[in-house]
């Protein structure tokens, strides 16, 4: 009987611009264990600062306004040794990430999953939800181009992501979901009494700790794993079929962990077909470049128009114009923003939806 192949996935909490330290620890782990890391998943606070002008969009106390390491990778002076998939947190160069709101490479080997999305790699379906929850911004559209006036709200999760993701588990199970904010209530599904001893400040929030948006997504998608950062501590919990893992921040021992999962097929990083169909079908709500989504549209209603015939046509057109394989794009982020929107609109128009 053939031995089952295993993929060894590194999962990381908050990076806070310490890329070299993260990759150093991952490399040392490989050397000490003899295990080869398949790819890396990070749960936010990446701080993708290209140059000092980006500091304007980084929402942190003044003493933490530092460039970090990312610019070295952006400039090509350093190269990420592993494919690194990440979502956004609440301490980000939010202007950079808004350009790539549908996802994209920020530099070689570092892929941002966007505001929300689903990608496939090595037979796994991975969902990402960026940002943290603030009730006063959950229905606020994004404005483009990004303005420093929006620095306090760009990283707040909008509730439309619930509808964008809600149907993704209908075709096959989601293997891993990522969020920066914990799903609300998940703290009560683990050893919260022990957690409170180490993090007494969490006790006052109790079951209300975390994002209600992420709670809905977790209960809808029911992924095998849900991985979060933000709270700078390690924590495990069980919610139905989902194993929840929270991690700390780089520089502390609880920042990195590993998942050993079956490798059924080795595949490149690809767009998830269901996600592609959702992206195209909801184009009317995102067609205004200056402000999106248009809340006069119902995301759920737009998605209800999906049919097998339309899905097939969407994937054919996506493969024709973009391709399912996600390829590193070295164009500037504003060009990527314009190019992606151009092709999404083109595909939608060719469907001739009434």
Curated annotation (Swiss-Prot):
Transmembrane segments: none annotated. This is Lariat debranching enzyme. It comes from Entamoeba histolytica (strain ATCC 30459 / HM-1:IMSS / ABRM). Binds 2 divalent metal cations per subunit. Its cofactor is Fe(2+); Zn(2+); Mn(2+). Cleaves the 2'-5' phosphodiester linkage at the branch point of excised lariat intron RNA and converts them into linear molecules that can be subsequently degraded, thereby facilitating ribonucleotide turnover. One of its GO terms (biological process) is mRNA splicing, via spliceosome. The keyword Zinc applies. A divalent metal cation 1 binds at residues 14, 16, 232. The keyword Protein biosynthesis does not apply. PANTHER family: LARIAT DEBRANCHING ENZYME, RNA LARIAT DEBRANCHING ENZYME. Its EC number is 3.1.4.-. GO terms for molecular function: iron ion binding; manganese ion binding; RNA binding; RNA lariat debranching enzyme activity; zinc ion binding. It is found in: Cytoplasm, Perinuclear region. Pfam families: Dbr1_C, Metallophos. InterPro entries: Calcineurin-like_PHP_ApaH, Dbr1_CTD, Dbr1_N, Metallo-depent_PP-like.
